[in-house]
């Protein structure tokens, strides 16, 4: 454990309840906090107004640093201005890379979502896929919109399907109806592991011949890539996002260091397919991939 004085860092995400992705982020953050002698205050709310309130609470608690996801940057800018006015250093992670610097963060940890989407689109184009359905589980989330835009840039026949990610039964029925109506859909893409695992059911129920591809990872999804039910996934390595964000704030307090040199620190995209999924599964079983 670092010999530096105890410090308090708030990590404030837009995580919905039950999404395993955020467990991995939190694991990374907690590991960095333990090493850096940091008291970690982890909170999250998928509703933008409530996430802004959590930021204001952290400012009132006089934390030493704030790590924040920027899925809805406009809704958070006033709260983050209060943090910068109070002299609290900020890093962003996971979502909102484009807005990060103007909202006062000194760096951003995450994957460039447009590039990640293009990586998926290129891989699908190589495989001969022409009619992907890209499923967005949270309308207006800048990162998810960028992923599908990236896919569409490489495969112009891509269609967007909006679903309510907070209700998996509704995700399954909406995707099933879409696949039944769109006989030419040849691949359906989930933008998160729990969504993709649900889309596998939709493909079966719809009697569709569409293949399934994904973004993000958990151990169930890694297993589906190993056994060939899912073509591949693109991992943004969320453990690194949580770890990097907390550690960067500690480094800033320790020596005024600003990791990233004013640029983002990229944690992805990392493609996981049958060639490397078994290796990744080992780490997914530990909850770090």
Regions found by a protein language model. Give the residues of each.
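Short, solvent-exposed amphipathic alpha-helices that sit
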Residues: 20-36, 116-120, 142-158, 174, ...
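Hydrophobic alpha-helical
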Residues: 52, 68-84, 151, 165-223
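Extracytoplasmic "Venus flytrap"
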Residues: 7-32, 36, 41-53, 57, ...
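Hinge/cleft segment of the Venus flytrap/periplasmic-binding protein
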Residues: 154-155, 240-289
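Hydrophobic alpha-helical segments within soluble ligand-binding/sensing domains
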Residues: 51, 107-132, 170-172, 218-221, ...
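Flexible loop/hinge segments that line or gate small-molecule binding clefts
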Residues: 74-115, 218-231, 281
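Immediate post-signal peptide segment of exported/extracytoplasmic ligand-binding proteins
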Residues: 1-9, 34, 125-128
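Short, low-complexity disordered leader/linker segments with a strong preference
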Residues: 1-8, 81-88, 289
